[in-house]
C-alpha cells in the first residue's frame, strides 16, 4: 500500500466502475497543478479505454508519468469474476500493442520493465525525465489488486484481501 503524507494527493473514481478514468484524470490533475509530479498507475485494459488521450499529452506537452501495470488481462474484471462469480471467466484476456512504441509515436518516452530488479532504475529514469513518460511494467497475469471496492459498494466497504474487509 502507498501511504500518503499530505492531503490532496490522490485522484480516484472510488471504485465506481469508471474504467478508463485514470489517463484523463491524470492529465487534468497535472494541468490543474502543474508544479506537482503526477503519476498515473493504470492497468493495460484501463489505459486502452482512453488511450487516444495520449494525443492530448502530445499536443499540450503535459508532463504525466504513466506506470502501466500490464498483465495482458482486463485485470479488475477478471478479479471480480474470480471473487464474486465463482471463477466464471469471460472475455478478459487481452492481446496488447507495443505500448512503448505506441507512446513513442506520440512523442512520449517509454521503457519496458520485465523483471523486478529493473524497476528501481526505471522509476528513477522516469521521474528524472522532463516530459511525459510511460513505464510498461509486466506484472503477474493472475495477480489480484487490493484494496478494492466491490461492485455496487462504496469506499467505506473496501476489501483489503480475499478474506478481509475494512
Features from the language model and the residues they span:
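Thiamine diphosphate
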Residues: 1-166
